[in-house]
Amino acid sequence: SLSTKDKETVKAFWSKVSGKSEDIGNDALSRMLVVYPQTKTYFSHWKELTPGSAPVRKHGMTVMKGVGDAVSKIEDLTAGLMELSELHAFTLRVDPANFKISHNILVVFAIMFPKEFTAEVHVSMDKFLAALARALSEKYR
């Protein structure tokens, strides 16, 4: 679970990187589709799945808006993300095993923000993204 220090670290780091959300989301989603090709099945309705394509860029931004929303609801992720959990469970039917983007977001943070993404920030962001994935999985139980 997230300590008070983790929450402070996540909020502080997010305030530094959120202005680059579109680029972070595009790169993270592009990487996910390459590294975890099985995730492409959820996006088969898109005309183009290549890294950096318009649909990938657009959905990457959507994902990062969700991450930003989660940062603002960090005190109670499960309640705060219930609507998003229901969407993924009942409408999109995404298997929680395919919530693979968080690892790619961490990679992109490390690449884009090498000075700011310290080991301490890495640990807190990893814990936060794991908590976010658990909150999104809530409606699958």
UniProtKB/Swiss-Prot annotation:
Domain Globin residues, every copy: 1-141
Tissue specificity comment: Red blood cells.
SUPFAM superfamilies recorded: Globin-like
Residue numbers of N-acetylserine PTMs: S1
Molecular function as annotated in GO: haptoglobin binding; heme binding; metal ion binding; organic acid binding; oxygen binding; oxygen carrier activity; peroxidase activity
Keyword list, A-Z: Acetylation, Heme, Iron, Metal-binding, Oxygen transport, Transport
A cellular-component GO term for this protein: haptoglobin-hemoglobin complex
Additional notes on this entry: This fish has two hemoglobins: Hb1 and Hb2.
Protein family per UniProt: Belongs to the globin family.
Entry protein name: Hemoglobin subunit alpha-2
Species of the source: Notothenia angustata
